Curated annotation (Swiss-Prot):
Lineage of producing organism: Archaea, Methanobacteriati, Thermoplasmatota, Thermoplasmata, Thermoplasmatales
RNA-binding as UniProt keyword: yes
One MF annotation (Gene Ontology) recorded for this entry: structural constituent of ribosome
Protein name: Small ribosomal subunit protein uS19
GO CC terms of this entry: cytosolic small ribosomal subunit
GO BP terms, alphabetized: ribosomal small subunit assembly; translation
Biased composition (Basic residues): 11-23
Stretch list, region Disordered: 1-23
HAMAP family attached to this UniProt entry: Ribosomal_uS19
Residues spanning the membrane: none
Functional note: Protein S19 forms a complex with S13 that binds strongly to the 16S ribosomal RNA.
Gene3D superfamilies xrefs: 30s Ribosomal Protein S19, Chain A
Length: 151
């Protein structure tokens, strides 16, 4: 262990970490496969399809059904409150900044479309299943729980 005037190696590293300035917000500009958001928004759909992942390319190359077409119309238009049951629409750069409410099977979950979501499905950002929270055993689950008082 090397000890010098400033202290041990560990304390020197700790001081160096603390002295670094913490940056707030986004440290670097958003880019998707080397393209900025502005460049992506200026691209035609054919150019954009070439840089998207295979699953998104395949989905966009096929014709959309009626529900998907209606949702895309709303997303590209000037609608304020967009509620939908359609979860299988690929997020495109023109949708960035829109606020969408997607149905999860029970209620609508509201979120804003961010640049990092490009190329993903709408349904990926709304969970359909609740997180399991285990508690004590139910009535009749064990022999001793038969005699537990109900709430």
């Amino acid at each position: 262990m090397v000890v010098n005037k400033q202290g041990s190696v560990k304390s020197i590293k700790r001081k160096a970490r603390k002295s670094r300035k913490v940056t707030t917000g986004r440290a670097k500009e958003f880019s998707y496969k080397g393209y900025t958001l502005e460049q992506l928004q200026e691209m035609s759909l054919e150019e954009l399809i070439k840089i998207l992942p295979a699953r998104a390319r395949r989905s966009l190359s096929r014709e959309m059904n009626h529900d998907q077409k209606k949702l895309v119309e709303k997303l590209e238009g000037d609608y304020d409150d967009i509620k939908t049951h359609v979860r299988d629409v690929i997020i495109l750069p023109s949708y960035v900044g829109k606020i969408v409410e997607v149905y999860n099977g029970n209620s609508y979950s509201k979120f804003e479309i961010k640049p990092e979501m490009i190329g993903h499905y709408l349904g990926e950002f709304v969970m359909t299943r609740k997180e399991v929270k285990h508690s004590g055993p139910g009535v009749g689950a064990t022999r001793s729980s038969k005699f537990m008082p109900l709430k």
